[in-house]
Amino acid sequence: MSSNVIEQAGAIVVRRGRVGPRILLVTGRRNPDNWIFPKGHIEEGESRRDAALREAREEAGVKGAVAARAGSISFDFGRSRYRVHYYVVTTDQRGQEREGRRLRWHGYRQALRRLTYDENRAMLRTAWPVIRTLLRTR
């Protein structure tokens, strides 16, 4: 495995739903059966926050605002080590399928069941108190 770590940024995109916060998941590019958060590379000169917003736009057609930093996860894929820095992104948009990906909005429990990877489930659990506070119904 390479000693270099590939830095990426991801977005936990949320919006207010009729019965509580809704969480956006998209299918993976390499494996369309995997459900994940929008994420990807950080362009040269781009901040992690801006990269997270760009990935949400590119992969799900959603424009939003970074509301909080959620945390980071690391994983190995092939011969590389990745570190993904996640941000909670709020939006009032529904998005549109892009880049050959499907997208779905889920409640918290449904998102936990649908997410493919344990690391993503752990990240959602960590971010959930912040999401609930941000999208508290008035």
PLM features: residue spans?
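The catalytic Nudix box helix
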Residues: 37-70
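Nudix hydrolase/Nudix homology domain
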Residues: 30-35, 96-138
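Active-site-adjacent beta-strand/loop module that shapes the phosphate/pyrophosphate-binding cleft
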Residues: 65, 72-100, 104-108, 119, ...
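N-terminal strand-loop-strand
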Residues: 1-37
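Short hydrophobic alpha-helix segments
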Residues: 27, 70-73
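Structural detector for helix-capping/boundary residues
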Residues: 9, 40, 54, 106-109
